[in-house]
Design a protein with these regions (language model features):
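Catalytic core of pol beta-like nucleotidyltransferases
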Residues: 1-27, 33-38, 46-94
Length: 94
């Protein structure tokens, strides 16, 4: 079970998520990264990846983590929402 940022980063590496989906890093923000009670895990994806891969990534994460996962693509994010996310984002890196 993933309970904090460090265990989430270890999970991503173990599952080879970065290589499987062509990502160099994944931003984690929101209540999960702040260590508060969380209902879902909010992720910021900076690279452009095909829509089907994005769906596959979300489905895999939700199945494995047993939590809803919200993915925000930086390129398409509303500026106000992105600015808020960037205030507490932590990056899990390959």
């Amino acid at each position: 079970m993933v309970s904090d940022f460090q265990s989430f980063q270890a999970y991503l590496r173990e599952k080879q998520v970065f290589d499987r989906f062509g990502l160099s890093r994944i931003g984690v923000f929101g209540s999960f990264v702040r260590g508060e009670t969380y209902r879902d895990i909010d992720l910021l994806i900076e690279e452009d990846i095909p829509y089907q891969q994005l769906i596959s990534l979300r489905e895999m994460l939700e199945k494995d983590l047993q939590k809803p996962v919200d993915l925000m693509l930086k390129r398409y994010a509303e500026p106000i929402i992105l600015r808020r996310a960037l205030q507490d984002v932590r990056y899990a890196v390959k």
